[in-house]
Amino acid sequence: IQFAETLEGSIRQTGVHACGILISRDPLTDHIPIMPTEGESLMTTQYDGHFVEPIGLIKMDFLGLRTLSIIKTCLDNIKKSKHIVLNENEIPLDDEETFKLFTRGDTTGLFQFESPGMKKHLRALQPNRFEDLVAMNALYRPGPMEYIPSFIRRKHGEEPIEYDHPMMEPYLKDTYGITVYQEQVMLQSRALGLFTRGQSDTLRKAMGKKKFELLAELKGKFVEGCKNNPDFVQGAKEKGKDVEELVNKIWGDWEAFASYAFNKSHSVCYAYIAYQTGFLKAHYPAEFMAANLSNNLSVITKVTVFMDECKRMGLSVLAPDVNESYNDFTVNSHGQIRFGMAAIKGVGEAAVEKIIEEREK
């Protein structure tokens, strides 16, 4: 019992955020206690992550994505095989061939869009604008997935688009009247409930972290703000709705939304990367597939999937050749992919480098 009482209330273990980096203008030790952590090259904070922001530190999430390496490898392949220097940041966001690829569901190898379920929804949605891809990226996750069929029907005019209040239309028009992003709720809270920027950001945090007690506190402010907003009151009357009931209806929908709330900035970034890979696959298929294969050399299941995709696309993959193959998969001037020797089981990079060295003598 004595030992149990001693241990009671103590922390069992500490965890480390996979990609959270704290930034400060002064030494971090002036603000928080830090400690070394096994297996980590950087020091970590002894404070729980929830308490870092309130004391004035910025936490940035720096994600390392394999897809970025695939894009870089693909651009290198294009330069070598076609002598074209392509800048991924200059890829147009209205390319017809790219959207055709998405509408066919030919998205194997495309970041965030290659699951069978996503392919099925893309074929039904027939996306023809970048905003559709952003919305699908946010909707295709547990919770909001149930809204995808309605989203698709509304896009094609098969289901009426309705707004609880006229003031909500500017913020929900792009998503066919369905609340998809946290930012939409933030903007509406300011327009309808007269929230300040700070209060709307607090609402975002409450939704993102699913802090239902804080949401309950904010509800009172929202109800009061809507009642004191003459534009909201007038709009409710035009709709023939009771102000109190309408406010509670809107807030109730937001509370349900809080269980799957997603931020648009995140979706835009991911959809942008997916669109870039879609453009590369549509216009430079051999170079793109070679890049995918090269970045998954040691994962035989991935290599098999991408080889099958090459076959489906009608791309020619040439067998390994000591006179032509390199460590990675490459593309020749005829648009054929040459198998990378490093993908051969039992052949290491050192052996490949030796072969290349010998043939170049």
PLM regions: where:
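Noncatalytic, beta-rich nucleic-acid-contacting surfaces in large DNA/RNA-processing enzymes
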Residues: I1-K361
